[in-house]
């Protein structure tokens, strides 16, 4: 599997923020978000045999593995990796951009899906796979990064149209106004969490955390 980095840190995004995890960041992404904070994962990387990668995971003390990228689901051995980690008794949080089907990846309650819905500011051309919504479960959630009012309007409209029974995280782009987002959500009754990237609050905006 083509890997950018493997590191230990605190999960900084979404409803599982604060949990210590082993992060396995794959290389290559099938889209190019304008404000992506891991553009270094688009190129390079190191090919690590699946058996070696699983050995690293097995030795890690964390009970959670964050499988991220890049876009991890483009990796040929993605499903085999996830199945093997689940067989170890560990939880896997898959961070995916929603353009690839998750149908085969929701076979266990130990798997948790963090699925992006890309807003206008991302300036991506590859579309979100709407069929993925029907595979999301209670422990899964949709994450929308919000940079400006146009993104916020988009996010609220998406929740209005498709949000029944689904959980959402509205995540302010790093450096944007979280209070402005919160003020729009309070009192609406939406099933939305407004959460910043806490790993950047703890460590700063640097790779490997």
Swiss-Prot record:
<dbReference type="InterPro" id="IPR024924">
    <property type="entry name" value="7-CO-7-deazaguanine_synth-like"/>
</dbReference>
<feature type="binding site">
    <location>
        <position position="38"/>
    </location>
    <ligand>
        <name>Mg(2+)</name>
    </ligand>
</feature>
<keyword id="KW-0408">Iron</keyword>
<feature type="binding site">
    <location>
        <position position="70"/>
    </location>
    <ligand>
        <name>S-adenosyl-L-methionine</name>
    </ligand>
</feature>
<feature type="binding site">
    <location>
        <position position="33"/>
    </location>
    <ligand>
        <name>[4Fe-4S] cluster</name>
    </ligand>
</feature>
<comment type="pathway">
    <text>Purine metabolism; 7-cyano-7-deazaguanine biosynthesis.</text>
</comment>
<dbReference type="InterPro" id="IPR013785">
    <property type="entry name" value="Aldolase_TIM"/>
</dbReference>
<keyword id="KW-0456">Lyase</keyword>
<keyword id="KW-0949">S-adenosyl-L-methionine</keyword>
<dbReference type="Pfam" id="PF04055">
    <property type="entry name" value="Radical_SAM"/>
</dbReference>
<dbReference type="GO" id="GO:0000287">
    <property type="term" value="F:magnesium ion binding"/>
</dbReference>
<keyword id="KW-0004">4Fe-4S</keyword>
<dbReference type="InterPro" id="IPR007197">
    <property type="entry name" value="rSAM"/>
</dbReference>
<comment type="function">
    <text>Catalyzes the complex heterocyclic radical-mediated conversion of 6-carboxy-5,6,7,8-tetrahydropterin (CPH4) to 7-carboxy-7-deazaguanine (CDG), a step common to the biosynthetic pathways of all 7-deazapurine-containing compounds.</text>
</comment>
<feature type="binding site">
    <location>
        <position position="36"/>
    </location>
    <ligand>
        <name>[4Fe-4S] cluster</name>
    </ligand>
</feature>
<dbReference type="GO" id="GO:0051539">
    <property type="term" value="F:4 iron, 4 sulfur cluster binding"/>
</dbReference>
<feature type="binding site">
    <location>
        <position position="29"/>
    </location>
    <ligand>
        <name>[4Fe-4S] cluster</name>
    </ligand>
</feature>
<feature type="binding site">
    <location>
        <position position="25"/>
    </location>
    <ligand>
        <name>substrate</name>
    </ligand>
</feature>
<keyword id="KW-0479">Metal-binding</keyword>
<protein>
    <recommendedName>
        <fullName>7-carboxy-7-deazaguanine synthase</fullName>
        <ecNumber>4.3.99.3</ecNumber>
    </recommendedName>
</protein>
<feature type="domain" description="Radical SAM core">
    <location>
        <begin position="16"/>
        <end position="205"/>
    </location>
</feature>
<comment type="similarity">
    <text>Belongs to the radical SAM superfamily. 7-carboxy-7-deazaguanine synthase family.</text>
</comment>
<feature type="binding site">
    <location>
        <position position="68"/>
    </location>
    <ligand>
        <name>substrate</name>
    </ligand>
</feature>
<keyword id="KW-0460">Magnesium</keyword>
<feature type="binding site">
    <location>
        <begin position="10"/>
        <end position="12"/>
    </location>
    <ligand>
        <name>substrate</name>
    </ligand>
</feature>
<dbReference type="GO" id="GO:0016840">
    <property type="term" value="F:carbon-nitrogen lyase activity"/>
</dbReference>
<dbReference type="GO" id="GO:1904047">
    <property type="term" value="F:S-adenosyl-L-methionine binding"/>
</dbReference>
<keyword id="KW-0411">Iron-sulfur</keyword>
<comment type="subunit">
    <text>Homodimer.</text>
</comment>
């Amino acid at each position: 599997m083509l890997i950018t980095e493997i590191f230990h840190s605190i999960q900084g995004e979404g409803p599982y923020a604060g949990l210590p995890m082993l992060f396995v960041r794959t290389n290559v992404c099938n889209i190019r978000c304008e404000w992506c904070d891991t553009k270094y994962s688009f190129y390079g990387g190191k090919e690590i045999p699946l058996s070696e990668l699983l050995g690293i995971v097995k030795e890690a003390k964390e009970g959670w593995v964050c499988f991220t990228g890049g876009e991890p689901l483009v990796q040929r051995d993605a499903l085999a990796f996830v199945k093997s980690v689940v067989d170890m008794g560990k939880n896997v949080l898959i961070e995916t951009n929603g353009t690839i089907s998750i149908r085969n990846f929701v076979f266990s309650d130990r798997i948790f899906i963090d699925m992006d819905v890309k807003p206008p500011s991302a300036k991506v051309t590859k579309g979100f796979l709407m069929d993925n919504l029907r595979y999301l479960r209670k422990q899964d959630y949709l994450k929308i990064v919000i940079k400006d009012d146009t993104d916020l309007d988009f996010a609220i409209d998406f929740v209005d149209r498709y949000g029944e029974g689904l959980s959402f995280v509205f995540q302010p782009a790093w450096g944007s106004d979280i209070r402005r987002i919160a003020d729009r959500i309070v009192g609406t009754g939406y099933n939305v969490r407004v959460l910043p990237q806490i790993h950047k609050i703890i460590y700063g905006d640097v790779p490997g955390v």
